[in-house]
Curated annotation (Swiss-Prot):
Family statement drawn from the similarity comment of this UniProt entry: Belongs to the CinA family.
Coiled coil residues, start to end: none
Cited PANTHER family: NICOTINAMIDE-NUCLEOTIDE AMIDOHYDROLASE PNCC, NMN AMIDOHYDROLASE-LIKE PROTEIN YFAY
Organism (species): Streptococcus agalactiae serotype Ia (strain ATCC 27591 / A909 / CDC SS700)
InterPro entries the UniProt entry points to: CinA (IPR050101), CinA-like_C (IPR036653), CinA_C (IPR008136), CinA_KH (IPR041424), Competence-induced_CinA (IPR008135), MoaB/Mog-like_dom_sf (IPR036425), MoaB/Mog_dom (IPR001453)
Lineage, top ranks: Bacteria, Bacillati, Bacillota, Bacilli, Lactobacillales
Record Pfam families: CinA, CinA_KH, MoCF_biosynth
Name of the protein in its database record: Putative competence-damage inducible protein
Amino acid sequence: MRAEIIAVGTEILTGQIVNTNAQFLSEKMAELGIDIYFQTAVGDNEERLLSLLDIASQRSQLVILCGGLGPTEDDLTKQTLAKFLGKSLTVDLLASQKLDRFFASRPQFARTPNNERQAQLVEGSIPLQNLTGLAVGGIVTSKGVQYMVLPGPPSELNPMVMEQVVPILSNNGTKLYSRVLRFFGIGESQLVTILEDIIKNQTDPTIAPYAKVGEVTLRLSTKAENQDEADFKLDSLEKEILALKTLDNRKLKDLLYGYGDNNSMARTVLELLKVQNKTITAAESLTAGLFQSQLAEFSGASQVFNGGFTTYSMEAKSQLLGIPKKKLQEYGVISHFTAEAMAQQARQLLKADFGIGLTGVAGPDELEGYPAGTVFIGIATPEGVSSIKVSIGGKSRSDVRHISTLHAFDLVRRALLKI
């Protein structure tokens, strides 16, 4: 079904409010398998709204109007739609009764004739009752086009959509099902290059790549009658994607760390630690506790994490972790030695299964001859100690610190999965 959204309100055009309704409606329509082709904002002007309705009626099967249902003269959405369709306005009994109760309980407010506009419906509409406000919404069909009228305030529109509109539109058949794949260790441009043939020939399911700070996600989407049908199609596409290799011959499946919009590398590692009944600690320099903070964001962190160290200076590394100061001076604070020593000492001091050490140059200035973005990360496990050097160039100080923690979590993930 082709659909479009028309947001009515001069305040949107003047920038006084942000049109969050369009985002919410687009997301919900996509979940129902309804394609939003156009989004438009128009002021409180009958002539311009009539012109827009004329265009919408010729190109869309569903036209969603939000805003302009209030009691004032510039709230003209229902009145203009009725004029466009050549229909009259009627009064919805339930909405009118709600107005009665509202003013009966508030004798200090005068009930003017304009208030009755909120209970009006375009003739022939299916009413959409407003559970949190006074203005009734509605759905009316004319010449094969459905027109949906919704209130403007999100506190009124959102529950109306979730509790009334979604069940009505769910009867249209297919819905949109999505699966999000999360990758670390590959950039968006390389991933798109690898997937070029699949993306070029895609119809259904589809692939949409998104770049985030330090990671990339792929949203796989398909239209299907039910979850089982969707899973069959998405499983097939995912299998095809994960069978590919990167330009430097790494397995793409090894770079997939999780699924879902709300997942993260920290959450993935936390769950792996819990499943394997392992514990972790960290000693952090440039990240200053960010690794530990991200781990502790999730419920159940105390099962795997007892504490850690923030050792920003050379003195703190020596005093808190027991790393000989002469060794730190010999190898440098920014080094494989220091990262490994931090990881090993933290692990031993807190008797954890895994220890992480993070040291490097967050920027913007260089340190010990290393440019900003140079990071050494050590990992200590029951099998031994190792470290990696990563270069995170061209990023802000905040991004360098965040991406450093992603690399650290990925080291732990790979150790747990023995990749």
